[in-house]
């Protein structure tokens, strides 16, 4: 019997889960700081809901539940649209959600079949203020995780829509062209050109598209190039650039950025950190999606890829810095007869907010220390005959090797001072 998890999915040992929970905790605290509220939706949705606007490629990646009309969610945006349509939340509705999604695609670096997304969305705000706040919040999250140079790229689907219209690319081909262009960084220009050719886009039109996408210069110059052909998209771009400057966020206009999902209708954006792992965050405006679920409204969101961030954090991490446990103190009884004393001490420490463990197996002191060391617990509070009589503990720091007899209250102060 093979006990490995399914292809493209992983188990996480305690030390890895601690890292993940710490990362998610940082992200969640910043989401809340910006006023986003939690919203929970099921992991399973009806296929009718999931297929509304996902496109053929994503539709083929949905994990379907046999003999039912249900499937696992492939992102957090479609469930949001359904939930908002079923509710009457005050506007603007600012929501966050952090949880797993599933896509049946070929696993590779930074891309799994089960992965955690951390999403924030704003429903009911049509202006660029929502986009600016989302991007600023995401950038703050990434900086708080120790990445001080996030690369933010923005574009606007209205610009590309206008370009396609000027080139007389049929409406029914637009989404296929978007999906091909979205693969530019992954498969390169030549392969994208082949895909566009296969979709029936004539070579002169392909050349015109790439002439625009490969435009050089500062942000103002790039926007100026499309101002005549796409005035609305260009105006939104200038407004967003101005707002992001007020947030202190540096951005790059990238006319090649399209994002592959079919539901985007306006600004789109990505955040990259290098490391050969693609974008760590991305999103955009999807004003038409909610109307498909019966409640027309404006909406925009951004998603942080926790798996990709964790992979980059793993690369950054120095040897020996891995935190294996939340436990701060191992309360060790010299003999089994002192277990009750150890239990009382542990409860006292816990009441002070200090995470503790006691021995549940009746092991001798040496084996208790071996367990504490291997678990990465930094402190031991030892209780025996002397400690019981003096109402104290022997506090040992496993890192420094220092050991002293102290009162419980002094032990609390020493441990908290090192937190």
Language-model region placement:
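Acidic, His- and aromatic-enriched active-site or binding-groove loops in soluble protein domains
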Residues: 58-67, 169-189, 273
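Phosphate-rich ligand and nucleic-acid binding surfaces
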Residues: 165-170, 203
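Polyanion/phosphate-binding surface patch
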Residues: 39, 43-70
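Short, conserved phosphate-binding/catalytic loop or strand-edge motifs used
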Residues: 114-118, 154-162
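Short, surface-exposed recognition loops or helix-turn segments adjacent to catalytic cores
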Residues: 149-158, 177-178, 252-258
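Positively charged, Gly/Ser-enriched RNA/tRNA-binding surfaces
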Residues: 16-34, 45-46, 75-89, 95-147, ...
